[in-house]
Structures are given as structure tokens and as C-alpha cells.
A protein has these predicted regions:
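Conserved short histidine dyad/triad with adjacent acidic residue
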Residues: 21-26, 36-53, 147-148, 160-175, ...
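Surface-exposed interaction/gating patches
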Residues: 135-177, 185-188
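Short, conserved beta-strand element in jelly-roll/cupin
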Residues: 39-42, 52-68, 161-165, 174-191, ...
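A short hydrophobic beta-strand segment most commonly corresponding to one strand
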Residues: 39, 83, 97-113, 207, ...
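A short, N-terminal "cap"/entry segment at the start of jelly-roll beta-barrel domains
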Residues: 1-34, 98-100, 104-156, 241-275
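Asparagine-centered strand-capping/turn motif at beta-strand->loop junctions
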Residues: 92-96, 216-220
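Short acidic-glycine-tyrosine-enriched beta hairpin
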Residues: 72-87, 195-211
Length: 275
């Protein structure tokens, strides 16, 4: 069965001066070490060493606030997702009080990318607000890629942002070959998980194992937005009988209506080679 973690109910643990963390995903609650996920909260000017083990890489997403990584000249804010290379050494310093940082790590990353030794050794930040917005062919959802092999240099994980306008529903489906999680950024929805309904709200995490049938209905008045990450990045998507495969069409714009930083053509979910 999928696992729902409500961050509002997870204990905050102090791990430094002005820094607390909440363990959202770990082997303790998922039974899996494909991906570990922590939500870290900082006071203004507080810093935390984010050094990774030699066999581990990961990524960061600022949920609220802003900050910087030591030796990296790019300021980090909620518009970016930053790839942390294998064995990264460095610290994050918050620029505002209440900065929240979503940090995911993939231990023993060679399990998911046999060419892990060839992955980029430098930090990489994807400004998702400049990435192309893709429109679902059969409903009102939109998608923005946040992490792909093209963007990060590895196929060990893949990330995207999905937006559901009010009243939007996607068909039931499951994935084969990867586990994945959704972190809700905004809004509420009804999730249909293995035939049972559950409510998801901002701050919740849904962890899906392989073969878990799931779908979402935004039955609220506001937009429902989540980010989802697959480990490994490549997997097969199987749609429920009678459902149309989820295909995505280019809109020719980024989330602000500007020309996007690159072009992505029509494709079906699960066939994202080269994206």
C-alpha cells in the first residue's frame, strides 16, 4: 500500500543552531532506501553542512525562503531544483527566517545509474520557471520537467511538477520499474489509492511503490500542485483498462507566458528519452 506522510505531524528535531529537520521518507517508514527525504527549516543566517557520502547524490528544492550553497554563485529560491553531485561537500546558508529546504538523497546511486561515475561533478540548478509548460492531451493538467537526464546528467531519478486546476482528474495508472513520491506544494485533492480514497494537502508526501494503482481528483476550488520524483528515472507507466495513455503537448511558453528555455515536443508519459 502507498504511504502518506503528513509533515505537520512529523516531529521537528534540532540538528544545529537555528536548524531543525523532519524525516519524511526513510527506511523506517517506507522499508526502502531508494530515496530519503527530509524537510529542513532554517532561521535567518543559519547554516547546515550537507556533505554526502561518496556513493550518494541528491537534490534540493527550496520550498519557502531562499539561501545559498558554499562556493556556488547562484542564489537558491523556490524556482530552482539543484542537483547535488556524488559525494558533494558543502553547506547551505539561509538568507531569510523560516526558509524551508526539501532535501532528497539517493544512497548507493550506482544501483540506478550504472554510469554514475560519469555523472556531473558540479552543482546544477534547473530554473523550472523557465522550462516549457506541457499540456495534457486529455484533461487540464500541466507538467513541467524539473529533473531529467538532460538537465542533471543522470537517469537515476526524474522529477516533474504537475498542476491540477479545480475539477481536474487524471486516469488511474501504475508504474513498473521505479518507486516514486509526490510532495504537495499547494492545495488539496482526493487521492484514489488501491481503491481507497484519502485526502492530500499542502505539505503531505505520498510514497508509491511499484505497481501501486493511483489517481488524483482536484475536488477543491483551488489549484492543486505537487512535485514528484521517480527513482530510478526510467519506468513503464501502465494505464487502467479503457484509459487513454497520458500524452503531453507543448504550449510554447513557460509558466510566466514567456518563450521557454528549450523546446520539448509531443510525447507519451514514460517515453521521455532525450528530454
Amino acid at each position: 500500500m502507498p504511504i502518506i506522510v503528513r509533515s505537520a505531524e512529523v516531529e521537528n528535531q534540532a540538528i544545529g543552531t537555528g536548524v531543525t529537520t523532519q524525516s519524511l521518507l526513510s527506511p523506517k517508514n517506507t522499508g526502502s532506501d531508494n530515496v530519503l527525504l527530509d524537510l529542513i527549516t532554517f532561521g535567518n543566517g543559519a547554516a547546515l553542512d550537507l556533505t554526502l557520502k561518496a556513493d550518494t547524490f541528491g537534490w534540493l528544492q527550496v520550498v519557502d525562503g531562499s539561501g545559498s550553497l558554499a562556493g556556488y554563485d547562484l542564489h537558491l529560491d523556490p524556482d530552482g531544483v539543484t542537483y547535488l553531485p556524488l559525494g558533494y561537500v558543502g553547506a547551505f546558508t539561509a538568507a531569510t527566517d523560516g526558509t524551508r529546504l526539501l532535501m532528497a538523497t539517493v544512497p548507493d546511486a550506482v544501483r540506478f545509474d550504472s554510469d554514475v561515475a560519469e555523472t556531473p561533478s558540479e552543482l546544477r540548478t534547473t530554473d523550472w520557471s523557465r522550462e516549457p509548460v506541457l499540456q495534457s492531451e486529455h484533461d487540464e493538467r500541466t507538467r513541467i520537467y524539473m529533473a531529467t537526464r538532460t538537465l542533471t546528467g543522470t537517469s537515476a531519478y526524474r522529477g516533474e511538477m504537475i498542476r491540477y486546476p479545480s475539477g481536474t482528474q487524471a486516469p488511474a495508472h501504475h508504474h513498473e520499474g521505479a518507486e516514486h513520491f509526490q510532495y504537495v506544494l499547494k492545495g488539496n485533492c482526493t487521492a484514489l489509492l488501491a481503491g481507497k480514497t484519502s485526502q492530500l494537502s499542502a505539505g503531505d508526501v505520498l510514497y508509491n511503490y511499484e505497481m501501486e494503482v493511483h489517481s488524483f481528483l482536484n475536488d477543491s476550488d483551488d489549484e492543486f500542485i505537487f512535485v514528484e520524483f521517480f527513482v530510478p528515472g526510467g519506468c513503464k507507466t501502465v494505464w487502467a483498462p479503457g484509459a487513454s495513455p497520458c500524452a503531453w503537448l507543448p504550449t510554447g511558453a513557460d509558466i510566466m507566458g514567456r518563450p521557454p528555455s528549450r523546446d520539448i515536443g509531443y510525447h507519451v508519459h514514460g517515453e521521455e528519452k532525450g528530454i
